[in-house]
Amino acid sequence: MVKTFSITDIGKKRKLNQDYVYSCETRIGNLPNVFIVADGMGGQNAGEYASKVAVDTMVEEIAHCALQSPVRILRHAISRANTRLRELAAKDVHLFGMGTTVVASTVVGRHLLVANVGDSRLYIISDRIRQITKDHSLVEEMVRMGGIDEKTARHHAEKNIITRAVGADDEVNVDFFDV
């Protein structure tokens, strides 16, 4: 049995909490459970709206998806959320440029499947803390390429510039992790 708890925090820099969380510990569509965290892009229009629309769209798609593979279900749901945000932004100038990060997961048997777009993170906490997702950010790319070390990255002025987001481009590239 899976038990969860979620909480969001506005942090010290923002005036508006752009986080949106969804947790379903029981079957939804063809998934045994699903957990989603989205964080609207802070410097962009309608970040809080983007995160809510993305999660709501994903939940709706997961609930009605005929696909069987958990990877395909999550990829489809994130893709539909991406399309929905792009459609809404095209109709309203106030929504132009909106986007959100997404981390979605499902526990299937003894495996945790994680889908990730952006720089929101999923950690496993047991006897130690282990970061599962990899940030899609400018600074993380600099670390991966050897341009800067992780200590420098933590304080880098551009650490919040993300390279992937749901709603940012016509197609969304999703990373998956199987734990």
Model-derived segments and their meaning:
Residues M1-V179:
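PP2C/PPM-type serine/threonine phosphatase catalytic domain
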